[in-house]
């Protein structure tokens, strides 16, 4: 009975903070907003340095960076109905991470989230650090890392891209659930119980969304290779070398 009551309480919170699972303005306590900004900013700075050093002087990479940003904006702006009147969305972060590495996407993802907060009331300024860390940092590194691991163990390119993109989506929601659990621990069970509740609720919609995003990313990457085959093929094969 206590578990049912706890889940019901979490469900009652969802419409208040979840706008496509970007944590909304004013929802996180101020100390947590500062913490997540302080964690995100070093990745933002590293991404800016990386872009200036490795991408800014290459027109083909700049075009792909712009495309990756548009892809993230389009997918993460979608708001699909979820449980208790809330909504969920794909992130789109995996495509850019696979093509260009995670550091550029730490910048692009943050810019996308800023525009969404200002133009779409989607997320917020005080919660931008938390949202950017979960999607643009954790999601990007998860997508890139699993893509590389899958390729090294012998999986096909399409399977590797699928796993990378899907994991980027799922990691975003795992970290968001952790952020909410840390800020709002359960009275019984603390952070662990709260995390289990939040992540369990959003798994209902995020698992199928992650699968769909993985499939879409494979399709988009294949189309990019057809129309920009030399550039995209080189990036897909050599992303890990670029990161070094």
Swiss-Prot record:
Membrane topology note: Multi-pass membrane protein
Compartment annotation: Cell membrane
MF terms (GO), sorted A to Z: cobalt ion transmembrane transporter activity
Record's signal peptide: 1-20
Keyword Ion transport: yes
One Pfam family per UniProt: CbiM
Residue ranges crossing the lipid bilayer per the database entry: 31-51, 63-83, 95-115, 117-137, 161-181, 201-221
Keywords: Cell membrane, Cobalamin biosynthesis, Cobalt, Cobalt transport, Ion transport, Membrane, Signal, Transmembrane, Transmembrane helix, Transport
InterPro entries: CbiM, CbiM/NikMN
One GO term of the biological process aspect: cobalamin biosynthetic process
Role, per record: Part of the energy-coupling factor (ECF) transporter complex CbiMNOQ involved in cobalt import.
Subunit composition and interactions: Forms an energy-coupling factor (ECF) transporter complex composed of an ATP-binding protein (A component, CbiO), a transmembrane protein (T component, CbiQ) and 2 possible substrate-capture proteins (S components, CbiM and CbiN) of unknown stoichimetry.
Name of the protein in question: Cobalt transport protein CbiM
Source organism per UniProt: Thermosediminibacter oceani (strain ATCC BAA-1034 / DSM 16646 / JW/IW-1228P)
Source organism phylogeny: Bacteria, Bacillati, Bacillota, Clostridia, Thermosediminibacterales
Gene encoding the protein: cbiM
């Amino acid at each position: 009975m206590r578990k049912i009551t706890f889940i019901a309480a979490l469900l009652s919170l969802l419409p208040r903070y979840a706008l496509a699972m970007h944590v909304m303005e004013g929802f996180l306590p101020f100390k947590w907003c500062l913490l997540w900004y302080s964690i995100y900013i070093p990745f933002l700075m590293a991404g800016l340095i990386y872009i200036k050093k490795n991408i800014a002087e290459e027109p083909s990479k700049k075009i792909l960076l712009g495309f990756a940003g548009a892809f993230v904006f389009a997918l993460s702006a979608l708001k699909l109905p979820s449980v208790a009147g809330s909504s969920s969305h794909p992130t789109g972060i995996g495509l850019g991470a696979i093509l260009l590495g995670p550091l550029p996407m730490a910048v692009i993802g943050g810019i996308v989230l800023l525009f969404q907060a200002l133009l779409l009331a989607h997320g917020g300024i005080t919660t931008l650090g938390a949202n950017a860390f979960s999607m643009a940092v954790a999601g990007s590194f998860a997508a890139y890392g699993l893509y590389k691991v899958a390729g090294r163990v012998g999986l096909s390119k399409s399977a590797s891209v699928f796993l990378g993109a899907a994991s980027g989506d799922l990691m975003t929601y795992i970290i968001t659930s952790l952020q909410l659990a840390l800020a709002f621990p359960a009275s019984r069970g603390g952070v662990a119980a709260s995390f289990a509740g939040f992540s369990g609720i959003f798994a209902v919609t995020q698992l199928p969304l992650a699968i769909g995003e993985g499939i879409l990313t494979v399709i988009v990457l294949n189309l990019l290779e057809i129309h920009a085959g030399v550039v995209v093929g080189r990036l897909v094969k050599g992303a890990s070398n670029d990161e070094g």
